[in-house]
Amino acid sequence: MSGQTESLMILIAGPYRSGTGDVPSKLVANVQAMEEYALPLFRAGHVPIVGEWLALPLVELAGSTQIGDAAFNEIFHPIADRLLARCDAVLRIGGASQGADQMVASARQYGLQVFTQLQEIPGCAGIVEPID
């Protein structure tokens, strides 16, 4: 990253449950897809964040026994909204996702930048998308 590019805290938003049938291996794959974008963002000088990094440990500590139970719902989406209030931007990746779309809508309400490709992000010109 050049010294002229401002470092941004960027929330990487993509599908988590969508299209998985809540199958654990598919949920893990969706988190990994978001994580694939974290390293290029970091190397470009930004602070990448995936909401699941914060939400999932808290959901477990809250005693959730299955996705969508009361403990899960208490934490999973609300923490994303709290996190957004402290971010500079959102990178929306992947396919259909009501949750990720809600994060984008909230980001726009907060006046945050919303990106859909790495190349749109300052300092990321020429970086190949990890996942097409």
Task: List the predicted regions and their residue ranges.
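Catalytic phosphate/metal-binding cores of nucleic-acid and nucleotide-processing enzymes, i.e., regions
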Residues: M1-D132
